[in-house]
Amino acid sequence: MVDRPKESPASDSLLADGSEHGADGAAALPDRLARYEKAHRRALRMAEYAEGQGEPQLAGKLGRCGHWLVFRHYYTVDKVRLHAADFCRKHLLCPLCAIRRGVKYLKAYMDRLDVVLAQNPGLRAYMVTVTVKDGDDLAERFRHLRRAMKAMTQARRDYLKAPAQRQHVEFAKALGGVHSIEAKRGAGSGQWHPHAHMIWLCHEVPSQALLAREWEAWTGDSFIVDVRPMDGADLVGAFIEVFKYALKFSELPLDDNWQAFRTLSNKRLIDSFGLLRGVDVPDDLTDEPLDDLPFLELFYQWLGRAGYSLAKASRVDDATAEAR
C-alpha cells in the first residue's frame, strides 16, 4: 500500500514548532518544552546505542544536544523564539535537530510557494507518492528508488526539450516541486520500504493511472503511486509530510534508526526542481529574532529525569539588547 499523509507525532511536532503555523506565545512554551524533552530523551537513548557501537564521539554529541536551551520572550507582542542551543546536527539520529531542520525547510518553501502561486494563477499543488518493492537490503533499495526517480526526471527533461519527438510523461505536467525520500519497515513484509513524497505544481491534473504505468516501467517492480490535490490546510500538511522525513527516522527502533543513519548519511534525501529550485534554507537551527523589541531571556537546563528546568531569567531592554 502507498503511504498516505496522515497526522503523526512527527507532523504534530513540525506543525506546532513552526511559528507561522502554530501557537508561538508564552502559553505554548510548556508544550514546546515537552516536545523537546521527548526528543532529547530519544537522543540520549540513541547516544547509548552509539556508544555500544564503538562511536563515543558521536554519542557525546548526541548526549549534549539540547542539554541547554535559550528562549527569548518578546513580551510586548507575546512571541517566543528559540535563541540558542547546543545542536549536534545529526538530524537522522537526533529528533530535536530533525524538528528544527524541518521547520526551517517548511518556512522557506512555504514562503517561496506564496510567491510562485501569486505569480502563476491557476497553478495547483499535488501530493505524489512513489514506492518500490520492499527488500532486506536498504542500500540496494535506496539505489533502486533513486535510479527510478532519475529516469523519471530524465524523461520529463527530454519531453520538455523536444515535445514533438519525445513521449509525454505525467511528470512533465509539473512546473516545479520538491521531494524527500524516507525509509521504514513495511507493515506486512517487515522489510525495508523506501519511498518518496513529492509536491508537484501543475496546471493540468496528473493522472494516477498513467503515472502508475510509467513508474512500473521505470522501476520494473512497482506500480504503487498516489496522486492527490492539496489546498489550504491540506497543502501545509503535504509540505510537512515532505519535510518531516528526517524526524520519522526517530520513530524506528534504535537498531533500524542506526542502520538507516549509516546507510543514508551524506545521501541526497531532499531535492527540488523548476519553480521551487534554489530555495535558500538557513543553516541556523534557531528561530529568527524580532529586532528592536525588549524581551525576557529564559535559560533552560536539562536536569535528567526532571526534564528541562528554568535556570535563569533576565529582562533585556532595547539598549541592553544592542550591546549583546
Regions found by a protein language model. Name each.
Residues 1-192, 202-324:
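Right-hand nucleic-acid polymerase module
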